[in-house]
Amino acid sequence: MKKIEGIEELKEQFISQLKPLKIYLFGSFANGTYTEENDFDFYIIVSDEVKELKDLTTQAYRSIRKIKKRSVDIIIGTESTFENKKKSPSVENEVMKKGYCYMNQKAKSGLIWH
């Protein structure tokens, strides 16, 4: 995937503020069909221990408010929810099939930066 302006700053902010297990970019930026008008679509996977996903989503948007250079859509889900839904028709299935994993905390070699 070619380097996309502004995306590294967003990823770093998500990592420091949300402590995610995985961060996926999906939609037009992941499949290379984006234009200047398109937004970033992120699916962020967090631990099953996180119970207040709505609060975490609000925190995610607040954390990038001053650094984002285009519109951003964020979906936050737990690891078990993602695993349960990724094989059926769902956003999770789309993310799994066509998304780009930007960060994987659970990779065998440790933290992976893509």
Feature annotation, model-predicted:
Residues 1-22, 30-36, 46-114:
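Catalytic core of pol beta-like nucleotidyltransferases
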Residues 41-45:
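Short, aliphatic-rich beta-strand segments
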